[in-house]
Structures are given as structure tokens and as C-alpha cells.
């Protein structure tokens, strides 16, 4: 069984109550970065036990692999509440040794352009371009953080950019208008630091830290790259709780 299959089965066990996928975790070295879950395998077991069988539905719509890392993009339904999440699993010697995630409440209506937070393509292409596509996203984020906005049009095809963020429309004009509208509501998007860039072929995930309004926030931005341009975007953002409210001391990143 592949690392991707292990990751998907572990997430699905939240729904099924099957404890066998917990055996994919290294009990001696597992590090948890979900700040609402206690550290180690015992902390994860306690979290799973707190979600009785049948109360959570899990649908993983995408899974990608980059070296020792697996990235998944999933829908989680807990009662009447639906959340969208990216999970990152790091593997060593065939076992899961570290986990990060980022969750956002799903909206009840689509984006201004009619897209949902998880729909769209999922099949990997251009695996030979993985390194180039990750480097492209590093350059984009470097320019974004440095405020070099004059370079932005060069990263997009303009009218061929599909946006799955629920508050933002398609294309570069939709992106700019959406961000301006959020800023007027006191919810300006600001990136301060990139922590990880992971990818497989034409899909790249950027894990970053910044502010959403006045809240310290984790940004997970997931891109589909086509012909060296940003063609499609999905994301989740999650406020980082203050230290006194965290269940482990490993940090969000």
C-alpha cells in the first residue's frame, strides 16, 4: 500500500471508527501540529475516540506525494457543519511521523464565479515539471511578500485563472477585486513567511503564515500550474490560536 493510500485510510478512519490505520503511525516519533490535538499517538487516539463512529463523514478529493510528504485535500462533515481541510503527512521508514493541517468552514454558496472549494480537476500531469512549478511558486510568494506587485500579471494568463476561494472571482481582475473587498471589511490578506512548498507535477501547495485582518493566520494555497502560469487556485485559511489555548507545543508549522 502506498503512502497516499495510508494517508487517505487514516483520514477515513475518522468516519469508520476503524483503528487499524492508526498502526501506520510511528508511536515513538509522531509529532502533531494540529493545535487542537494533544501530541503523540496517544493524543491522536484520544481525538479519534472523541468523534464517535458515524458522526463524521470524510471525503478526500485529492492526494499528492512529494518525497517523504503526502498532501490531501478533503471534505469533513460533522453533523450540520462542513469543513474543508488540507492535511500534510510526513513519512519515515514507511510510517507517519508528523502531521500538519489547515481547516476552514465551508461556505453554503459557491464563489462569485460559481466554483466550490473542492471541485475542479485532480489528475496529476507534468510530473517532470515538479521542480520548476515549485520554483515558480517560490518566486511568486517572494514577490508577494516583498510587495513587488508589478510582477503579478506575469504569473497569470489573466482570463484563464480559475478561483475556488469562496469570496473571490475568477481571473486576475476577480482576484484583485475580491482582495480589495475583503480589505474594506477589515479582512486584509497579508503574507509574512512561507514555511513549505510541496508539489507533484502540475499541483503545488504553499504553506504560509500571515495576517487575515488582525488575526495571525495559517494560509494553505493550492495551485494548478499550466504552461508556467497559475491556472487554478484552492485554499484554506485558519486562525492560529494563542499559546494558552493550544493542546501541544509543536507549533502550527
Label each PLM-derived region with a short phrase.
Residues 1-253:
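C-terminal and inter-domain tail/linker signature
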Amino acid at each position: 500500500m502506498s503512502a497516499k493510500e495510508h494517508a487517505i485510510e487514516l483520514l477515513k478512519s475518522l468516519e469508520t471508527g476503524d483503528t487499524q490505520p492508526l498502526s501506520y503511525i510511528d508511536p515513538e516519533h509522531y509529532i502533531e501540529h494540529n493545535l487542537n490535538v494533544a501530541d503523540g499517538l496517544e493524543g491522536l487516539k484520544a481525538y479519534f475516540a472523541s468523534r464517535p463512529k458515524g458522526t463524521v463523514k470524510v471525503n478526500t478529493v485529492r492526494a499528492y506525494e512529494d518525497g517523504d510528504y503526502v498532501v490531501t485535500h478533503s471534505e469533513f462533515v460533522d453533523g450540520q457543519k462542513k469543513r474543508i481541510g488540507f492535511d500534510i503527512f510526513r513519512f519515515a521508514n514507511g510510517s507517519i511521523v508528523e502531521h500538519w493541517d489547515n481547516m476552514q468552514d465551508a461556505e453554503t454558496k459557491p464563489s462569485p464565479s460559481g466554483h466550490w472549494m473542492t471541485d475542479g480537476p485532480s489528475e496529476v500531469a507534468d510530473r517532470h515539471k515538479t521542480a520548476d512549478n515549485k520554483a515558480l511558486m517560490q518566486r511568486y510568494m517572494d514577490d508577494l511578500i516583498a510587495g513587488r506587485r508589478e510582477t503579478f500579471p506575469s504569473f497569470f494568463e489573466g482570463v484563464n485563472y480559475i478561483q475556488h476561494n469562496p469570496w473571490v472571482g475568477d481571473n486576475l481582475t476577480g482576484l484583485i477585486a475580491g482582495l480589495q473587498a475583503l480589505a474594506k471589511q477589515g479582512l486584509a490578506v497579508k503574507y509574512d513567511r512561507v514555511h513549505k512548498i510541496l508539489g507533484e507535477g502540475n499541483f503545488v501547495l504553499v504553506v504560509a503564515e500571515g495576517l487575515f485582518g488582525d488575526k495571525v493566520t495559517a494560509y494553505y494555497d493550492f495551485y494548478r500550474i499550466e504552461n508556467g502560469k497559475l491556472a487554478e487556485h484552492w485554499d484554506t485559511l485558519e486562525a492560529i490560536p494563542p499559546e494558552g489555548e493550544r493542546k501541544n507545543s509543536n507549533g502550527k508549522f
